[in-house]
Amino acid sequence: MYEVRFHGRGGQGSVMASGMLAAAMVEEGKYAVSIPSFGFERRGAPVVSFLRMSDREIRQLTNIYQPDCIVCVDPTLTKSVDIFAGMKAGGTLVQATHHPLSELALPDCVSTVGLLDAVKIALEIFKRPITNTLMLGAFAKTTGVVSLESLKRALEDSEFRDAGLAQNMTALERGYAEVAVHHIERRAAA
């Protein structure tokens, strides 16, 4: 089983991204379940969403406390939320940020990092900092667990139409093309 935890802010579409990723996994013949976490959060408040994917039926519908991968769609969130809490050793981070890898403080559990200046690109495409579809493209390239084509089909099957569909398709493709993927070698303690 592969578990993903999405971190974002209300209104950025992290819950929608989790659902779209689940649809793409089903498109590939896998089992997937998206688990949104709703409370009384308002637009701009930190939110979290969860996704499990597997080759077998998934019966566990709880929150994810030890993710294999963390997708953070908001570059400011790491200042106020411990997004790395419980992350498994050898984990993957897909982060929206304009900072290079050398400027990020990453815990030892992270071994693969996908960095994307998603806010800049979102402002070019949408004229708003909505980064969710960009980060799905970045997730696909960074992890390799889902194909870009399956994400495109899931996007086509979503509620987006006309200009919104075209913009989100562009965002998905640019996220995939422009993410910088880094593999971090960690030395074992002596």
Swiss-Prot record:
Induction: Induced anaerobically by phenylalanine, phenylacetate or phenylglyoxylate.
Superkingdom: Bacteria
Pfam families: POR
Catalytic activity: phenylglyoxylate + NAD(+) + CoA = benzoyl-CoA + CO2 + NADH
GO molecular function annotation: NAD binding; oxidoreductase activity, acting on the aldehyde or oxo group of donors, iron-sulfur protein as acceptor; phenylglyoxylate dehydrogenase (acylating) activity
Classification via InterPro entries: Oxidoreductase_gamma_subunit, PadE, PorC_KorC, Pyrv/ketoisovalerate_OxRed_cat, Pyrv_flavodox_OxRed_cen
EC number assigned by the record: 1.2.1.58
UniProt pH dependence: Optimum pH is 8 when measured with benzyl viologen. Half-maximal activities are obtained at pH 9 and pH 6.8.
The keyword Ribonucleoprotein appears for this protein: no
Keywords associated with the record: NAD, Oxidoreductase
Assembly and binders: Dimer of heteropentamers composed of an alpha (PadG), a beta (PadI), a gamma (PadE), a delta (PadF) and an epsilon (PadH) subunit.
Functional note: Involved in the anaerobic metabolism of phenylalanine and phenylacetate. Catalyzes the oxidative decarboxylation of phenylglyoxylate to benzoyl-CoA and CO(2). It can also react slowly with 2-oxo-3-methylbutanoate and use different electron acceptors such as benzyl viologen, methyl viologen, FAD or FMN, but NAD seems to be the physiological electron acceptor. Also catalyzes an isotope exchange between CO(2) and the carboxyl group which proves partial or complete reversibility of the oxidative decarboxylation reaction.
Protein name: NADH-dependent phenylglyoxylate dehydrogenase subunit gamma
Native species: Aromatoleum evansii
Record lineage: Bacteria, Pseudomonadati, Pseudomonadota, Betaproteobacteria, Rhodocyclales
Gene: padE
